[in-house]
A protein has these predicted regions:
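Short beta-strand/loop motif that positions the catalytic acidic residue
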Residues: 172, 177-180, 184
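Conserved HGGG/HGGXW glycine-rich cap/lid loop of the alpha/beta-hydrolase fold
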Residues: 1-43
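Conserved alpha/beta-hydrolase "acid-adjacent" motif
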Residues: 185-191
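Catalytic histidine-centered segment of alpha/beta-hydrolase-like enzymes
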Residues: 186, 212-227
Length: 234
């Protein structure tokens, strides 16, 4: 049995994955989306389906902060973890740290002052650059702005830049696929590299690195199924 559980990042929802899941479903993958609930009071956390299959694949797709939102139990039991523009510590150690922190504090202020909509629109727009927002998410995003869960947006934004130790719960022999966009305007390159370096040093099996040209923090206009299928068969 081939299973996928996804976790979107901050300011997004499960519809972020809709364009990608089509090819997986066509190829007999069982797909479940976690929903954090930024645009409503509804949230959902999927669980692995028990299977006796000897060729079991349990793959998590984590985008950005989604790695920290995904329950540890799900990650522990995964055979494959796909990290898409993910991080352990969002803030870099270099002198860019204070500049990025000030930007995050301005975003917090917008939420506190009850002005989150324009801020979130700008964040999502920059997240998809140099591409456009994917159509499935775009339709839902603009409709859902009226029902924003501002309390959750704010508390998760504060969590996003907390300093963290290395995630020791990861299995040493876990197969990790580390996807890194080359035009990411949200996640600093240093933060991404630091996470990859830590994984390389700590795990028995080095992560498989995939660099994507012409992609931003949020992926669009690519066939994620083919990219991952090639790595699974490698």
């Amino acid at each position: 049995m081939k299973q996928i559980i996804t976790q979107h990042g901050w300011g997004l929802n499960k519809y972020f994955w809709d364009d990608y899941k089509v090819d997986f479903l066509k190829n007999n993958w069982h797909w479940q989306d976690n929903e954090r609930g930024y645009f409503s009071t509804n949230n959902y956390q999927a669980k692995w389906i028990k299977s006796e299959s000897k060729k079991e694949i349990r793959m998590t797709l984590c985008h950005s902060f989604g790695f920290h939102l995904m329950p540890k139990k799900i990650l522990k039991e995964a055979t494959h973890i796909v990290l898409i523009n993910s991080f352990n510590n969002f803030l870099p150690l270099s002198n860019k740290r204070n500049f990025i922190l000030r930007s995050l504090k301005r975003m917090e202020t917008k939420i506190i002052k009850d002005e989150p909509k324009d801020m979130l629109k700008e964040f999502i727009y920059r997240s998809f650059m140099p591409n456009h927002m994917n159509n499935s998410f775009k339709k839902i995003f603009y409709k859902s702005l009226e029902s924003l869960n501002k309390t959750l947006l704010l508390s998760d934004l504060k969590e996003l830049y907390m300093n963290r130790d290395f995630p020791v719960f990861l299995k040493k022999d876990c197969k990790i696929i580390f996807i890194k966009s080359e035009n990411d305007l949200i996640l600093d390159n240093e933060s991404s590299n630091n996470f990859l370096d830590s994984l390389n040093k700590t795990l028995d099996r080095e992560p498989t690195l995939i660099k994507l040209a012409q992609q931003g923090h949020c992926l669009n206009n690519l066939n994620l199924y083919e990219i991952l299928r090639n790595k699974l068969n490698a």
